[in-house]
Amino acid sequence: MELNIFALAFTSAMLHPWREFFIKQNKNPEGACLAAMMVWTTLAALHAFIEGIDLFSIQLIWPITLASGLGFICFFIFALRTYRDGDFSSYYPITRADPLFIAIISFLFLGKLYSFILIFGIILVFIGAFFLQYRSGWGILSQPKTLCLAILAMIVHGMVTLMDARAVQVVEPMVQFFWVSLIAVIPLGVIFALNRPKDGHVFEYLFGGWRQTPGSFLMIGASAYVSYFLMLKAF
């Protein structure tokens, strides 16, 4: 069973960087982020329909789902600002270092113990993160504000993951994902629109990328959905 969980988590970790990579490379990362959440919501609804699962079963854990959705809003605000101001290869490992945060919180407050294979997997992730961010003559401490934003993104994502892990003990992963995405997508759209460049048209700023790079938008959403679904299945 633990090997199955490790395989799900590892596959999820391999897929997940595609979302941030495509968002960072897109000339309009806010629009790409919004597109990803629209794709997630659609895929989750289709997945639930195919599986014959009632999306309204979320009422059993509505407070957890609402908190998770608000956490997603905060995560993307912190993460997008981090990727805009800092080097992606340096700060992505920090924003995605939530397994360490989860392990510490679970051990200290939830009394959870982890097996050797899971601890080994976390250690491998952080060894890889070190080599990703390492650059001779340069350090992440050179941008303290960006570093703080990256750490905040990591903490928020860790809290969201803990809430989602609790949620999928009651409902199916696609149900949780659908409502979390639906809760977050509209507030994020409003926030992105209010903070757009002064010379940017709101519709073009938020949705113009669907005309310019529809393939990358679909890739962002689909890869992230599969990644997060596998992670929730592991829980």
Question: Predicted regions span which residues?
Answer:
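Membrane-interface interhelical linkers
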Residues: M1-L70, C74-G86, Y134-L149, L182-F235
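Hydrophobic core positions of alpha-helical segments in small-molecule transporters
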Residues: T11, A35, A67, I94-A97, ...
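Hydrophobic transmembrane alpha-helices of multi-pass small-molecule transport proteins
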Residues: M38-A44, I104-F107, I117-R135
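Hydrophobic alpha-helical transmembrane segments in multi-pass integral membrane proteins
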Residues: L43-L55, I102-L118, I155-V171, I220-F235
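Short, charge-rich binding segments
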Residues: L80-D85, Y92-I94, F107-L108
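Transmembrane alpha-helical cores of Major Facilitator Superfamily
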Residues: P93, A97-L100, I151, L182-V185
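Small-residue-rich transmembrane alpha-helices that serve as helix-helix interface/gating elements
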Residues: I123, F178-V185
